[in-house]
Regions:
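Bacterial N-terminal signal peptides that target proteins for export
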Residues: 1-10
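Bacterial N-terminal signal peptides
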Residues: 10-18
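Beta-strand-rich domain onsets/edges
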Residues: 24-45, 51-53
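Periplasmic peptidoglycan-binding/tethering modules of Gram-negative envelope proteins
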Residues: 36-39, 50, 59-62, 69-71, ...
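Conserved beta-strand core positions
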Residues: 46, 135, 165-167, 205, ...
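Short beta-strand segments within Ig-like beta-sandwich modules, predominantly Fibronectin type-III
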Residues: 74-78
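Periplasmic OmpA-like peptidoglycan-binding domain that tethers envelope proteins to the cell wall
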Residues: 170-239
Length: 239
């Protein structure tokens, strides 16, 4: 059953409030490296930096990181020698919004073999597309899950700091589900409604549903791979 936009947003708000009051926490997932030969739970020290992909020039930027604090996202100022102590058993979500660059979003585990990690930002251009893995939905529904709020806010900020940008919001679905195209489009529509309710001009947004046509993992073997197939992405349609 599909609920009206106001009900969806109310559910999202209630979920967020429950997180703020400490009754919910971000999910901590097991790192694949804990199953390797060199099993360790010792902290992993990594140096993070941000650079322009086209020039390799370092950029001082602010990241929104989930996982550093299990109760809430952390805003982290990153320069060329920002070193963090990471837990090898935890998944981290990273978001970066900078004017004139594509919105950056990824998930990582703290690989003990990686001592330095540089996030590469793509200069904005029409046609650029990126996935937003931290936008999640209640299982089996088209309703946004409260843990999506940091990614939704980053998408909102990306549109605001780039006033000439228009984007297509694209929903993707796993194979084997019923009405894949409708479900993927309705999930993209839920993101559209969130942005419009937050003040974004609807004329700068469009909605697409691609069903299971562009699965990242044709034969997923883990829950994470299946979740990656059920994703939201955005494409720059005007700049």
């Amino acid at each position: 059953m599909t609920f009206p936009p106001c009900i969806r947003l109310l559910g999202l708000l209630l979920g967020l409030l429950s997180c703020v009051h400490g009754t919910a926490q971000f999910v901590v997932e097991r790192s694949p490296w804990l199953d390797g030969e060199a099993v360790t739970e010792e902290p992993v020290h990594q140096t993070w930096a941000v650079a322009d992909q086209s020039t390799a020039q370092l950029i001082q930027a602010e990241l929104t990181v989930e996982g550093l604090n299990p109760r809430k996202p952390v805003r982290l100022s990153v320069d060329d020698d920002t070193t963090l102590k990471l837990a090898p058993y935890r998944r981290y979500s990273r978001l970066c919004v900078e004017p004139d660059f594509m919105l950056y979003a990824d998930y990582i585990y703290a690989d003990p073999e990686i001592q330095a990690d540089t996030l590469l930002l793509e200069p904005l251009a029409i046609g650029l597309e990126t996935a937003l893995p931290a936008i999640e939905f209640m299982p089996g529904t088209e309703d946004l899950y409260f843990t999506s709020v940091p990614a939704l806010e980053a998408l909102h900020a990306f549109i605001e700091v780039n006033p000439t940008v228009s984007v297509a919001i694209i929903g993707h679905e796993e194979e084997g589900t019923t009405e894949q195209h409708r479900t993927s489009r309705n999930r993209a529509r839920a993101v559209f409604e969130y942005l419009v309710s937050s003040g974004v001009n609807a004329n700068r947004l469009s909605v697409e549903g691609r069903g299971s046509a562009q699965r990242l993992y044709p034969q997923p073997t883990t829950p994470e791979e299946a979740e990656a197939n059920r994703r939201i992405s955005i494409r720059v349609t005007n700049y």
